[in-house]
From Swiss-Prot:
GO terms for cellular component: mitochondrion. It catalyses: 5-taurinomethyluridine(34) in tRNA + S-sulfanyl-L-cysteinyl-[protein] + AH2 + ATP = 5-taurinomethyl-2-thiouridine(34) in tRNA + L-cysteinyl-[protein] + A + AMP + diphosphate + H(+). Belongs to the MnmA/TRMU family. Residues 96-98 are annotated as: Interaction with target base in tRNA. GO terms for molecular function: ATP binding; tRNA binding; tRNA-5-taurinomethyluridine 2-sulfurtransferase. ATP binds at residues 10-17, 36, 126. It comes from Pongo abelii. Keywords: ATP-binding, Disulfide bond, Mitochondrion, Nucleotide-binding, RNA-binding, Transferase, tRNA processing, tRNA-binding. The active site is at 101 (nucleophile), 223 (cysteine persulfide intermediate). This is Mitochondrial tRNA-specific 2-thiouridylase 1. Catalyzes the 2-thiolation of uridine at the wobble position (U34) of mitochondrial tRNA(Lys), tRNA(Glu) and tRNA(Gln). Required for the formation of 5-taurinomethyl-2-thiouridine (tm5s2U) of mitochondrial tRNA(Lys), tRNA(Glu), and tRNA(Gln) at the wobble position. ATP is required to activate the C2 atom of the wobble base. NCBIfam families: PRK00143.1, trmU.
Length: 422
């Protein structure tokens, strides 16, 4: 008789992870619920919902009659996620801590805790995503040695597991999983909600006494900020660096700000005394000035070229067609739930890529992740380190005057005018 499979499910205190645990129980697995505490609310005077979330996760386990564990990754989160968050903002970039958290905390720390401490055969989360493995295939996976060197040997990991988009395309969360490095973790992960819609998940919760999580507002934004003012929060950790708001059209000074790193491209600039809204289109890291333009559709907000850091490829590193041709057509997005944009990737020798979008996109920003897709498959992602000239710059013929948008320590393989080396 085959032993009952043990699945350790990450519980956030929300409806998605609660229903994920419920569905695992229905499949006959031995399920253990684990709540991860990643931020110490005692560090701040602001509001943090971690304690309430933990209580809700514990109550889920009581309703489902499964064991409950709580584990603290406060130190790891600070070192690997929050410190990176601050460093990126200090460089004037716009980081995505959710992507970094999944990479370092959920699919590294939590995965190893579940396997090594709780004896899990597999882990599960409430993410809306799928893999190329069925449940039984997940349980048949053996430990794979961590790859060495710049790229994984494509013959070392046969039939690598693929990360696939969820049935609910609007709720799909492969974007946030695009930096999960460990094939070992991914091939031993179950996503019970991958084939379901959010509305159906809510229906399941309502029919199974999970009303306390069903009624909660969906968590948005960063857990460590809560309801606090973002600018005030950031200035608790970073020194103010006052500068000017300058019109991109005539170089007129329109106002002052407390730090160029507080703004991301596409964001509305809060400039007192102006009737119409102005939007951030450039940042000068040397002088500390923020360039702004009127109208939300100003051409200075649109670009069709960017360069990433070395891309993390999930299943095939890098894809064979990209290695062979040095170019590859696919789609990308740099914000969750934005429409996929057709693009062409150009591979550099150091594993970075140039991304040329078929059409200019609004509000590209360094520090964000460009996440690549081919059909239903999420191929991986790379951090945006450099932007090409805006449509406004090209219209004025000022390509050479483009404001630097990355740290000098991150110099890319430059082509003329920031064009990819084709």
């Amino acid at each position: 008789m085959q032993a009952v499979r043990h699945v350790v499910c990450a519980l956030s205190g929300g409806v998605d992870s609660a229903v994920a645990a419920l569905l695992l129980r229905r499949r006959g697995y031995q399920v253990t619920g684990v709540f991860m505490k990643n931020w110490d609310s005692l560090d701040e005077h602001g509001v943090c919902t971690a304690d309430k979330d933990c209580e809700d996760a514990y109550r889920v386990c009581q309703i489902l009659d499964i064991p409950f564990h709580q584990v603290s990754y406060v130190k790891e989160y600070w070192n690997d996620v929050f410190s990176d968050f601050l460093n990126e903002y200090e460089k004037g970039r716009t980081p995505n801590p959710d992507i970094v958290c999944n990479k370092h905390i959920k699919f590294s720390c939590f995965f190893h805790y579940a396997v090594d401490n709780l004896g899990a055969d597999a882990i599960a989360t409430g993410h809306y995503a799928r893999t190329s493995l069925e449940d039984e295939e997940v349980f048949e996976q053996k430990h794979i040695k961590k790859p060495e060197g710049l790229f994984r040997n494509r013959f070392e990991v046969r039939n690598a597991v693929k990360l696939l988009q969820a049935a609910d395309s609007f709720k799909g969360q492969t974007f946030f999983l695009s930096q999960v490095f460990s094939q070992d973790a991914l091939r031993r992960t179950i996503f019970p909600l991958g084939g379901l819609t959010k509305e159906f998940v809510k229906k399941i919760a309502a029919e199974n006494r999970l009303h306390h999580v069903l009624q909660k507002k969906e968590s948005m934004g960063m857990c460590f900020i809560g309801k606090r003012n973002f600018e005030h929060f950031l200035l608790q950790y970073l020194q103010p660096r006052p500068g000017h708001f300058i019109s991109i059209e005539d170089n007129k000074v329109l106002g002052t700000h407390k730090g160029w790193f507080l703004y991301t491209l596409g964001q509305r600039a809060n400039i007192g005394g102006l009737r119409e809204p102005w939007y951030v289109v450039e940042k000068d890291s040397v002088k500390g000035d923020v360039f702004v333009a009127p109208r939300t559709d100003h051409p200075a907000l649109y670009r069709d070229l960017l360069r990433t850091s070395r891309v993390h490829w999930i299943a095939e590193e890098p894809p064979a067609v990209l290695v062979r041709d040095k170019m590859m057509e696919c789609h990308f997005r740099f914000r969750h739930q934005m429409a996929l944009v057709p693009c062409v990737l150009t591979l550099n020798q150091d594993g970075t890529v140039w991304v040329t979008a078929v059409q200019a996109v609004r509000a590209l920003a360094t520090g964000q992740f460009a996440v690549f897709y081919k059909g239903d498959e999420c191929l991986g992602s790379g951090k945006i380190l450099r932007l090409g000239p805006s449509a406004y710059t090209l219209q004025k013929g000022q390509c050479g005057a483009e404001v630097a948008t990355e740290s000098p320590t991150d110099s890319p393989e430059d082509g003329p005018g920031l064009s990819p080396l084709l």
